[in-house]
């Protein structure tokens, strides 16, 4: 019974992955023209300048906070699993 459930879950994951990849291709082709328009390099006196883009680099504090939150999530998950195993062994 569990084998059939696992098989169905794996098949549904394959279908969702293939659907996701086809939508990414469609999104890429539709946005390629807008991306190329936004990346216009400024040229002065024959020299090429830096690429112009709309995205900004996050501050180092934001990057550090993201890393710490990911670490806390992983450590919390490990502690929760070990706590659950200890509770199951006692019961």
UniProtKB/Swiss-Prot annotation:
Subcellular location: Cell membrane
Chief localization: membrane
InterPro entries in the cross-refs: Glycophorin, Glycophorin_CS, GYPA_B
Cytoplasmic side, ranges: 82-91
Record's keyword annotation contains Signal: yes
Post-translational modification as stated in the protein's UniProt record: The N-terminal extracellular domain is heavily glycosylated on serine and threonine residues.
Membrane association type: Single-pass type I membrane protein
Signal sequence annotation: 1-19
Marked site (Not glycosylated) residue numbers: 33-34
Keyword set, alphabetical order: Blood group antigen, Cell membrane, Glycoprotein, Membrane, Sialic acid, Signal, Transmembrane, Transmembrane helix
Residues bearing attached sugar chains per UniProt: 36, 38
Function comment: Component of the ankyrin-1 complex, a multiprotein complex involved in the stability and shape of the erythrocyte membrane.
Subunit structure comment from the entry: Component of the ankyrin-1 complex in the erythrocyte, composed of ANK1, RHCE, RHAG, SLC4A1, EPB42, GYPA, GYPB and AQP1. Interacts (via the N-terminal) with RHAG; this interaction bridges the (RHAG)2(RHCE) heterotrimer with the SLC4A1 Band 3 I dimer complexed with GYPA.
Protein name: Glycophorin-B
Species whose genome carries this gene: Homo sapiens
Gene designation per UniProt: GYPB
């Amino acid at each position: 019974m569990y084998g059939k459930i696992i098989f169905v879950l794996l098949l549904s994951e394959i279908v969702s992955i293939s659907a996701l990849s086809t939508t990414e291709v469609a999104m890429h082709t539709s946005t390629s023209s807008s991306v190329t328009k936004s990346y216009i390099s400024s040229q002065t006196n024959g020299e090429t300048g830096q690429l112009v883009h709309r995205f900004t680099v996050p501050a180092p504090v934001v990057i550090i906070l993201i890393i710490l939150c990911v670490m806390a999530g992983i450590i919390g998950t490990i502690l929760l699993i070990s706590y659950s195993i200890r509770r199951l062994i006692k019961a």
